[in-house]
Amino acid sequence: MAKKNNAKSAAGGNAAAKTEKKGKNQISQQQARANAARASAKISPAPEGPAPAISVLVPICNSEQYLEQALDSLAAQTFTDFEALCVNDGSTDGSLDIIKRYMEKDQRFRLIDKDNSGYGASMNLGIDTARGEYIGILEPDDFFEPNALELLYGLVKGASADVPVDVAKANYWFYWSTPKERNQLISVCKPPMTDAPFNPRDVREVFYCIPSVWSALYRREMLVEKGVRFLETAGASFQDLGFQFKVWVTAQKVVMSEEAILHYRQDN
């Protein structure tokens, strides 16, 4: 019996080792793919003049069905001092043509065109390219309220300047366009977190919040200096979890609003 158990244990150990090796190989291959896509990416030049207050990252991969609504919501912002970095992740539909149309109409729209390498790699290249003091995120099937950037930047500038605001965050709606248009408020930001600026390590409730990375602004200098990045895994699933956790353990000052600013599509 002991010999059989030992044999089973050895077999199990070998299987686990093979699985671990396979996983490491897949990660290495994905990282190599992301690095190659980054190296060959084509980035449109920034317009002359001072850097914008906000850089909004729009990660795009075969998103033509909803992309115009997303970009229209950016173009209609009441706060105008921003650049929109449209990161085309190897789209094979009409997404690239849509981006180019917006670039022709509005110099605030810029293109980062790269081979497909996943959501995380797209976001990190956007962070590296961004020039704004703060970075926002708009996914291509969602859309902002017209005052979204104005509200978030107002939170930043309305706080005392002794310590810079690292994160400004607001609420959002779940959104359905079919069979009938409707919104459902999702209250991530609520008292006591909305009462005053806070350090996330002092308010543990923030670590249990849904990681809605696209209803916020992040201070670019914090992300760059502290190495806060997205995981460059394949596809577009759950990269926001790791990013949000790293933001909370890094940020020194967070401000929140109970107002909702973004429609997060559920029928895509």
What are these language model-derived features?
Residues 27-268:
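Nucleotide-sugar donor-binding/catalytic module of glycosyltransferases
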Residues 1-40:
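Short Lys/Arg-rich cationic patches that frequently serve as NLS/NoLS or arginine-rich RNA/DNA-binding motifs
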